[in-house]
Amino acid sequence: MEYLGKLHQAAVEFPQTDIWMDSCGEEELEYGLKRGIVGATSNPIIVGNVIKNELNIWEKRIKEMVVEMKDASEEDIAWELIYEIGALRSKKLLPVFEANKGKKGRLSLQVNAKYYRNKDKMVEQAVKINSLAPNMQVKIPASAAGVEA
């Protein structure tokens, strides 16, 4: 078998190991999916890098959100964009999710780390993230409040 590089080789030769992509960037997900990844993880920093790399895709939407969300803070707008990107990019993993009956094919998105001491805020945001797509997975800080959440 001819491999598409080391990532693909690892996915084929070690099927017991699930390989995840540490990005929700469109090109990165396409690259990884062709080479056997079964999930992707993200957080606000990763999404920020995705936006920088894909500004041509997201710039118009950001401007629209600023107009639509007149009373929102920059942070609120940023989180709405994070949710949109997460929901959109989770669709790329949906075929893996469906083929594996939900055991693989998830996009993991982290709650806002500033809530690491607020169980209720983390739960509220986790419920929102979970509602974005059937294959969303939520990351919560391993703080005392996070464990309780």
Range-by-range predicted roles:
Residues 1-27, 31:
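N- or domain-start disorder-to-order transition segments that initiate the globular core
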Residues 14-17, 35-36, 132:
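Structured helix-beta-strand junction loops
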Residues 31-43:
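Catalytic domains of carbohydrate-active enzymes, especially glycoside hydrolases
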Residues 37, 46-49, 54-147:
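Active-site beta->alpha loop and helix N-cap motifs at the rims of alpha/beta catalytic domains
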